Regions:
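Soluble non-cytosolic domains of exported or imported proteins
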Residues: 2-3, 46, 50, 91-95, ...
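Aromatic-rich peripheral "rim/lid" segments of glycoside hydrolase catalytic domains that contact
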Residues: 62, 71, 76-94, 99, ...
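Active-site beta-loop-alpha junctions enriched in small/polar residues
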Residues: 24-26, 72-75, 116-121, 148-153, ...
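Short amphipathic alpha-helices and their capping/turn segments at secondary-structure boundaries
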Residues: 2-16, 56-64, 102, 130-136, ...
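Distinct, well-ordered alpha-helical segments
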Residues: 33, 82-85, 122-139, 158-166
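Short, hinge-like loop/turn segments at secondary-structure boundaries
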Residues: 37-40, 131-132, 194-197, 202
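Substrate-binding cleft and catalytic face of glycoside hydrolase catalytic domains
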Residues: 3-120, 187
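Structural preference for beta-strand elements that scaffold enzyme active sites
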Residues: 18-20, 67-71, 110-114, 142-147, ...
């Protein structure tokens, strides 16, 4: 089960590369059995909490001292900034996020812990993160930084909106990490759902795949310019932005080739 991760971490250590863990808790891709008891009924809060603790201890314990930081909780907010009513929320209550940070810190006290989410350039969601961070800090939860996902396109978001979020998060006293940075050159088929909700699964329409034979130079230049503008922004706030993580080795292997429609 751990063979691939073991090999990647060994490679990183041999080449003096820091490793970031993703992710300890996420509402997506959690097996249904986690929330059921041995009779197939809704599991008790105590049972779900025990499973969560065992999971965190198993994963973080295996790599204790070897993984620099972890996305402790991923995408726990709705687009309006309210807490997502996920199975984790329903099983453990609204304090479950603080619990994850506490359990993770116990498992590896030296690991940096982040809250990670997408569309944080939107004012409503940004406000939700600020409210969440304030609540976590009030509970003395060991949160180190805020992960601002970067699933962008050529025409969104506005750079000013990204900068406003960086400044707002910096003012909390936490560090900012730019995570999952990729920029799509393709038109987005559903403007109302721009972001990174992996549950979107739309039927392929060729009008949204205009560059099947290769990216025209003019569009490639636009893509280059967008990356340049973003990195200039990150450098302006290098006192707070500690890391930028690119989401994929190259554009040919990006997850966005198969989301929100496969093609």
């Amino acid at each position: 089960f751990f063979a691939a991760a073991d090999a990647m971490i060994a490679y990183a250590e041999a080449n003096n590369i820091k490793v970031i863990g993703h992710v300890l808790l996420w509402h997506e891709q959690t097996p249904d059995w986690v929330f059921l008891d041995d009779k197939g009924q809704t599991a008790s809060k105590e049972l779900v909490l025990s499973r969560l603790k065992n999971h965190i201890n198993a994963v973080m314990g295996r790599y204790k001292g070897r993984i620099h930081g972890w996305d402790a909780v991923n995408e726990a907010l709705n687009e309006d900034g309210t807490l997502r009513q996920s199975k984790w929320y329903k099983a453990l209550g609204e304090d479950y996020i603080a619990t994850v940070f506490e359990l993770a810190h116990q498992a590896d006290p030296k690991a940096q812990l982040y809250y990670n989410d997408f569309n944080l350039f939107k004012p409503e969601k940004r406000a939700g993160v600020l409210k969440l961070v304030a609540a976590l800090k009030a509970k003395n939860a060991p949160i180190y930084g805020i992960g601002e996902q970067g699933h962008y396109s050529l025409d969104y978001p506005k750079l000013q909106d990204v900068e406003d979020s960086i400044v707002a998060f910096k003012n909390t006293g936490l560090k900012v990490v730019i995570t999952e940075l990729d920029i799509s050159a393709l038109p987005f088929p559903d403007p109302e759902n721009i972001g990174a909700d992996i549950s979107l699964n739309m039927k392929l329409k060729q009008e949204f795949n205009p560059y099947a034979d290769g990216l025209p130079k003019a569009v490639s230049d636009q893509l280059t310019q967008k990356y340049l503008q973003l990195f200039e922004l990150f450098l302006r706030h290098s006192d707070a932005v500690e890391r930028v993580t690119l989401w994929g080795v190259n554009d040919n292997q990006t997850w966005r080739n198969n989301w929100p429609m496969k093609g």
